[in-house]
């Protein structure tokens, strides 16, 4: 473990030559500019090649402010944009398995979603960010990890525009919407 101003980097690297050291230095540089915490891991064949984490679970005004709760391997984080490709890959796998039709209404898989004029919203409209549910209203404060809370709100919520008529990045809701569909299809 090394310590910088008000953060500590916990590092495990199993890479040849200087590669592990360079990755760690870059991580430490980013962490030194951050006011929170972060993790970075690389696995190959189920074995860790790089595992780095450090900083604070709280947002601080400055990277030099004291760390109240250290960032650990177990710290949960909302990835937002980082999940879009993963979620779309899961949808593609469900299509490939023959259990998801992107042209079908979301309500075929998630009946409660048909509320508030959304009965004809398709899975494709969710995938292409045209559904008009760009936020949850009301916002379930401090419930980023509560799929049930978000899916219940999104099922009842009216879109902010006619689905399919506009495109806007569904930064917060994309994962919740498609996770709710996948959960109802697969049961997990």
Task: Give a label for each model feature.
Residues 73, 81-82, 94-138, 156, ...:
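Active-site helix/loop module of the DD-peptidase/beta-lactamase fold
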Residues 12-77, 156:
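Short, conserved catalytic-motif segment at the N-terminal edge
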Residues 73-75, 135-188:
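Catalytic-site signature segments of enzymes, centered on catalytic residues
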Residues 2-12:
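Short, contiguous pre-domain boundary segments
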Residues 21-27, 46, 78-103, 178-183:
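Active-site SXXK
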Residues 35, 77-86, 118-121, 168-176:
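Aromatic- and histidine-enriched alpha-helix N-cap/loop-to-helix transition segments
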């Amino acid at each position: 473990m090394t310590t910088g101003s008000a953060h500590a980097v916990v590092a495990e690297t199993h890479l040849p030559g200087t590669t592990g050291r360079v990755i760690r230095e870059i991580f430490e540089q980013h962490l030194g500019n951050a006011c929170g915490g972060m993790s970075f891991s690389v696995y190959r064949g189920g074995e860790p090649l790089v595992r780095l984490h450090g900083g604070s679970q709280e947002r601080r005004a400055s990277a030099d402010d004291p760390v109240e709760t250290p960032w650990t391997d177990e710290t949960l984080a909302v990835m937002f944009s980082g999940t879009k490709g993963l979620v779309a890959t899961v949808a593609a796998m469900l299509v490939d398995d023959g259990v998801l039709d992107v042209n079908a209404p979301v309500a075929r898989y998630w009946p409660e979603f048909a509320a508030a004029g959304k009965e004809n919203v398709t899975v494709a409209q969710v995938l292409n960010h045209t559904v008009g549910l760009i936020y949850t209203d009301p916002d379930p404060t401090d419930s980023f990890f509560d799929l049930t809370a978000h899916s219940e709100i999104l099922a009842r919520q009216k879109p902010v525009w006619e689905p399919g008529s506009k495109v806007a990045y569904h930064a917060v809701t994309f994962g919740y919407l498609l996770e709710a569909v996948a959960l109802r299809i697969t049961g997990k």
